[in-house]
Amino acid sequence: MVALNVGNGFLFPISWKGVGSLNESASTSESANAAFTVSIVIPIVSIKISTNPGFSTGHSISRPTYALQDVDGDGYLDIVESEKESELKVTRSAIGRTNMLKAVTNSLGGTFTLDYAHTVPTYGLPGGKWVMPSLTVDDGIHDDGPLMTTAFEYKDGKRDRHEREFLGFGEVITRNLDTEKENALYRKSVQKYDVSGYYTQGNLVNASVEDAAGKVYTETRNEYDGYYLTAKGDEYTFTAQPVLCSDRASAFVPLRYTANLQYEGAAQGMITSEAWNEYYLTGHHGELKSYRFSNKGKLGSKGDGKFDYQTSIRYTSNSSRNILGLPTDVTVTGGDGKVYHQVSAVYDTKYPNHLTRITQQLGNGEAVTDYRYDSFGNILQKTLPANAKGQRMWYKYRYEPEMNMYVERVEDAFGYRSEAGNFDYRYGIAKERRDLNNFYYETDVDDLGRVTGVRGPNELATGVPYIIAFEYSPKAEFTANGITAPAYAVTKHYDIQHPDDDMETVTFVDGFGRPVQVKKDGVVTSASEGTVFDAQNVMIVSGRNVYDAFGRVAKAYYPVTEELGKRTDFNKAFDGVSPTVTVYDVLDRATEVTLPDESKTLTAYTTDAGSRALVTTVTDALGNKQATYTNGSGKTVMTKQLSGPDGEITTTFEYDGIDRLVRVTDTEGNVTTSVYDMGDRRTEVNHPASGITTFTYDALGNVLTKQTANLAKEGKSITYDYDYHRLTGINYPDHPENNVKYYYGGRNASQNRIGRLMLREDGTGAIEYFYGKMGEVTKTRRTLIVPNQAIATYVTQWTYDSHNRLLEMIYPDEEKVTYSYNLGGQLEKVRGYKSYGYDYVNRIGYDKFEQRTYLKYCNGAETFYTYDPAGCRT
């Protein structure tokens, strides 16, 4: 009985008549036999001697005539037949790629298609391997660029005969094909792996990117160490071993050295960065002991060359609870021997990762941060380092009782409190929050964990259902020819000035979730001198993008407009103005950008061996050139303005071992230097114009003093006062009348001022702040001390909506100015009131770029704005 596999299961067993012929053979046998007897009689002793000589011969031949064998090594049995000795017939299996995944189409309309091939059997991989030689990606939208096709090549496959396991391929080549040019090779990435043994399998030893001509652009080299591991209880010992091959040993193969090289198409590469790792080999568990880094190219694979910095790490553990590898001390030392950072940590080793204290050395002190935990491992309290007055800011956390994992309350040393509640435990989302000033915010979530609506204190007070709402349509409409209606999401912004007409934004995505179009409400004005003002409510549609064969934006078009009523219909229109065209190199960097007015910006990438930097040279449309030199850490080490009336202008930048900027030299040789402490805080700046300015700090990081070059002559400094980490005062040594004081709202403050700046006093007087429900400043009371005159007080008030748009402003003379917005959210009209109403601005008009095109003042004066259609410039 045979049950056939149909891919997703087996059919009902059937009787297969040919099963008896799965293996047939034929045999032929021949034999011959001869014998005779000879007798000799001896009468005297009555003995008779007889002998029976004989011989026999035979041979047989047996050969299969019908069998199932894997002849071609594809992993499937072939039919082998032979009816005579001189003939062999093979019927190859047609299974091949049958039942292998061919294509996947998701609900967004995207499809990726896979192909398969069988590698040629070799000595290293006798049976070969089914592999994926190509992958084609279709985003479902076919008028914005070609399909993306990637081809793969596999080499040096290895099967460990001893372990009977496939160790992988020694080399994998990824080829990006230009589907716009008949699948011509554009670039290839080559990854080489160590497959020499079971313990080293899968280690990446080399990775490079090349162009179609085989010129290398980048390369990464990795080197590994090999160790045998022996354990005595929880004490491990690692013994170096160049070749790892054992049936019983445990092995450790860590990364020792990494070098990154930049070629930019040249024959010789330049090392831009190196990293070297050292590990604990005795008494530990193979943790990282030290790490060295260099962007100078002088470190070497043994780590014995010059380096920028070295990070050394020490650990603690609790073997009885299998808690291992907790770092207790991290020290960063520069190549010059200077200690840049030193941080120590203390743990409660009864629990994993219960970090209880972090101590950072500052050079003239230390900064200590403490943590406390509950029985579930949640942080109960975090206490920050002390300020100059010994105050330590702390935060306490309380968790909801259902799951004991989500924070429901946060309190601090000021007595402030914020809360969260009504959790959707499916997704860990708090649906209700309360801020420091006791205002609530609500969030609606659907059954898929997506936010569908948000309400703030303004909406909760007025009964408005949302300030922002979201609608989702994640399933596209598509056929075999592509997407006909892309998936989209709608964002609604409630507009208090147009309560029946939300400001809406619709975002469309392609088959792989990439945003391809955004529509938004807008008002476009057609107005020019001598014509009638015309404003139309439309949807402004973002410009279409055309992608190249590698998913990069090759052409970017200007936006278009459409009439209302089609918000969820994908707009396929392309603007008539020439697009912005971008050309890229094989590393996906823009090399040429052509704007609609045909002006071009060119970018060239080269290397400079002298400074060991990547040089990026930009030439704009006017021929101006600037070169930027970047080191292996991504820091700018030099800029050169290569054109201009003053000739070449050069600025150089120097960094310490951990990439802090310490020296800037301009083209005339003027030098600015900076000095830092162990907390990365700048303690001194020496500027050629202003001289030396020094700063001091407390352990919390607050600036305590600032001393300029002029104040240093008198031995004086500007000082700063704090309450925990909040600035409360600035004190000037020579003019105390100019001192500044800051006052903040306490836990019972009114006017929504809890935790916010309430009053500032300075030499000119004072200013008091009042706030709205969402933290916006709604009123200020400014008191000025005018010499030889009375004290003057000025009150200014503002009203904002929940989108932080200014709706109304009341000046100190009680004039009220209101601001009106169009359906697209742009300012449209400004009107004033004082005794009577009058317009400041009657009308403001905009184009599809939301640039101003029209402005009419109350006196009838009109201003028209026109733009170059190609360059979009005035």
Task: Locate each region found by the language model.
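Repeat-based blade/solenoid architectures
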Residues: 20-34, 55-66, 110-115
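Structural motif
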Residues: 86-92
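Acidic/hydrophobic-patterned starts of short beta strands in beta-sheet-rich repeat architectures
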Residues: 1, 73-82
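Calcium-coordinating acidic loop motifs
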Residues: 6, 70-76, 95-96, 106-107
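Beta-propeller blade termini
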Residues: 62-71, 99-102, 119-122
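Beta-strand elements of repeat-based all-beta scaffolds
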Residues: 102-105, 112, 116, 124-126, ...
